[in-house]
């Protein structure tokens, strides 16, 4: 809607500027006549008197101009202004002169009668006169009477004039439609009783005087049209508007063309902006940061240098990671794996049952072998069962967690992994390396998973959320927990503990279901999951098992602070 209004305003301004140009041309033409024809110098000043908006037609200048035009004899080239009916009536009647002497009045009347006789003699002997008039056309702009254009027309008289001022009765009968309306109404008058042949000289005027024409108009063109056919001036075929088309179809086409050009320009500019910046990766665009966020970025960079999975950033670009990442939300339903390709249920069930029996036998054999290997590796009085800490970089200030662990317990093995770029295989590979470095062949007795999450779910990796449904249906999630179970100890007489810290998974019933499904996946190893609240007694016991309690409280108080005063922790 705003675009249509602005286009209409632009069309209106263009029309007004065109009319202003026409009036300026008319004024220049009048000045030219005043210089070239000295006898017309006084009358050329009033050529545009009827076009000015603020000038009243009843002013003394206009009435004196009309009287002069009726009294002075016509030369070969005469300039007059189209008068209105009231002006003609005033011109036909002798205007009273402000004199006190009747003798002076009689002398002036005798002079006027002699001038009229001389005028008739001159008209019979000279060539046809050219009369320059200024008319106002309403239909040139194609509007609803809001604006109007001026046209300077050169009218050539083709025959002898019958009378300069026709009788009042004839004017009243023929020109009822051309009543003078204020100082802006279009005037119409018989010039020597003939319809003229017009050759318009289109010109312009000042813009500030033209803007109020539409508001001063109160009647339509039909009210101003004379009744007689002879009074109607035929439109010239060469008369055209310089800026607008009067036909409605042409206007509509022009509107559509403007809209199309605007849309093409807008699209082309957007495409140019996109093409200029397309070569530069948008993820690397420099953004103005505060000092706090800059320091945080520096610390994160140092954190990624020693983080598991951060090396993958150099190997993969941002686009490849975005294309290969798991884009589904953790709350979306997981697609169910298709059934086996065997259509016969009987043969499939028999093969599955026989396969399960074979796998159970193999698992029993492997379980015994692994247990013996672990017993051999863990012999000695100096052996302390390892405690593994798996810390996600998604935890706020996670880079300081390795500095707040218990320093009197060498069995704690912290592993900080990259939440954004690491994979399950990277985590399992790092766990195997750390256990081998601690003691070859040993297994985990206690484990802490420090990550984000909530009631019923664990946010282990980016786009990898462990829920009770997804750990049963997503292949990657299932394989991770199964392989993680193989790193758990077989020598521990009690179930191996896996503490979940950083979130309260048991906040609803789905958390218990998640723990049950994870236990089933990690069999035959005995696993027990715990996720106590940190403020509870069990939570304090869990914290003291892995952390220095004083440093942990200091780290916890400054975990969400933007200040980097960790000198006590470092």
From Swiss-Prot:
Transmembrane annotation, as ranges: none
A single Gene Ontology CC term: nuclear matrix
InterPro entries attached to this UniProt entry: NSMF (IPR033374)
Domain of life of the native organism: Eukaryota
Membrane topology (UniProt): Peripheral membrane protein
Compositional bias (Basic and acidic residues): 209-224, 259-276, 339-348
General function of this protein: Stimulates outgrowth of olfactory axons and migration of hypophysiotropic gonadotropin-releasing hormone 3 (GnRH3) neurons. May couple NMDA-sensitive glutamate receptor signaling to the nucleus and trigger long-lasting changes in the cytoarchitecture of dendrites and spine synapse processes.
GO biological process, one term: positive regulation of axon extension
Region (Disordered): 85-224, 239-278, 327-362
Species the sequence originates in: Danio rerio
Lipidation (N-myristoyl glycine): 2
Protein family according to the UniProt entry: Belongs to the NSMF family.
Subcellular location: Nucleus; Nucleus envelope; Nucleus membrane; Nucleus matrix
Composition skew (Polar residues), residue ranges: 86-99
Record's protein name: NMDA receptor synaptonuclear signaling and neuronal migration factor
Taxonomic lineage of the native organism: Eukaryota, Metazoa, Chordata, Craniata, Vertebrata
Keywords for the protein's UniProt record, in alphabetical order: Cell membrane, Cell projection, Cytoplasm, Cytoskeleton, Lipoprotein, Membrane, Myristate, Nucleus, Synapse, Synaptosome
């Amino acid at each position: 809607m705003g675009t249509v209004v602005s286009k209409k305003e632009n069309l209106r301004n263009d029309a007004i500027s065109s009319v202003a140009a026409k009036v300026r041309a008319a004024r220049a033409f009048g000045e030219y006549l005043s210089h070239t024809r000295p006898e017309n110098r006084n009358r050329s000043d009033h050529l545009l008197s009827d076009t000015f908006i603020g000038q009243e037609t009843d002013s003394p200048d206009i009435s004196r101009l009309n009287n002069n035009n009726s009294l002075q004899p016509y030369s070969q080239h005469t300039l007059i202004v189209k008068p209105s009916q009231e002006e003609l009536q005033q011109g036909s009647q002798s205007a009273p002169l402000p004199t006190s002497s009747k003798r002076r009045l009689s002398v002036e009347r005798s002079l006027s009668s002699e001038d009229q006789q001389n005028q008739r003699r001159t008209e019979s002997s000279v060539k046809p006169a050219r009369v320059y008039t200024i008319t106002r056309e309403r239909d040139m702009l194609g509007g609803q009477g809001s604006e109007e254009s001026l046209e300077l027309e050169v009218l050539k008289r083709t025959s002898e004039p019958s009378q300069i001022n026709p009788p009042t009765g004839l004017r009243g009968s023929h020109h009822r439609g051309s009543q003078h309306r204020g100082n802006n109404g279009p005037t119409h008058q018989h010039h020597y009783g003939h319809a003229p042949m017009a050759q318009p000289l289109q010109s312009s005027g000042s813009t500030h005087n033209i803007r109020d024409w539409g508001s001063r108009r109160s009647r339509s063109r039909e009210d101003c049209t004379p009744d007689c056919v002879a009074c109607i001036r035929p439109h010239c075929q060469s008369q055209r508007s310089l800026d607008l088309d009067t036909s409605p179809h042409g206007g509509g086409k022009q509107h559509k063309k403007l809209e199309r050009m605007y849309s093409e320009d807008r699209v082309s500019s957007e495409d140019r902006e996109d093409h200029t910046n397309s070569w530069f990766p948008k993820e690397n665009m420099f953004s103005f940061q505060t000092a706090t966020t800059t320091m945080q970025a520096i610390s994160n960079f140092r954190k990624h240098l020693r983080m598991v999975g951060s090396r993958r950033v150099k190997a993969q670009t941002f686009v490849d990671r975005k294309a290969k990442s798991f884009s589904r939300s953790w709350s979306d339903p997981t697609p169910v794996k298709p059934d086996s390709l065997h259509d016969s249920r009987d043969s499939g069930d028999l093969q599955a049952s026989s396969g399960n029996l074979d796998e159970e036998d193999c698992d029993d054999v492997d379980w015994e072998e692994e247990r013996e290997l672990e017993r051999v590796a863990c012999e000695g009085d100096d052996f302390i069962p390892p405690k593994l800490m798996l810390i996600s970089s998604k935890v706020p200030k996670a880079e300081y967690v390795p500095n707040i662990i218990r320093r009197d317990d060498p069995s704690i093995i912290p592993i900080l992994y990259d939440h954004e770029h690491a994979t399950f295989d990277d985590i399992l590979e790092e766990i195997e390396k750390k256990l081998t470095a601690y003691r070859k062949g040993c297994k985990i007795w206690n484990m802490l998973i420090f990550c984000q999450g909530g009631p019923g779910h664990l946010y282990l990796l980016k786009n990898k959320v462990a829920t009770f449904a997804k750990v049963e249906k997503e292949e990657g999630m299932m394989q991770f927990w199964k392989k993680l179970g193989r790193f758990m100890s077989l020598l521990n007489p009690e179930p191996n503990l896996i503490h979940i810290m950083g979130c309260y998974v048991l906040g609803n019933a789905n958390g218990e279901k998640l723990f049950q499904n994870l236990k089933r996946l990690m069999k035959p190893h005995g696993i027990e999951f715990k996720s106590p609240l940190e403020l509870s007694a069990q939570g304090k016991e869990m914290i003291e098992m892995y952390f220095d309690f004083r440093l942990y409280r200091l780290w916890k108080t400054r975990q969400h602070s933007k200040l980097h005063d960790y000198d006590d922790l470092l």
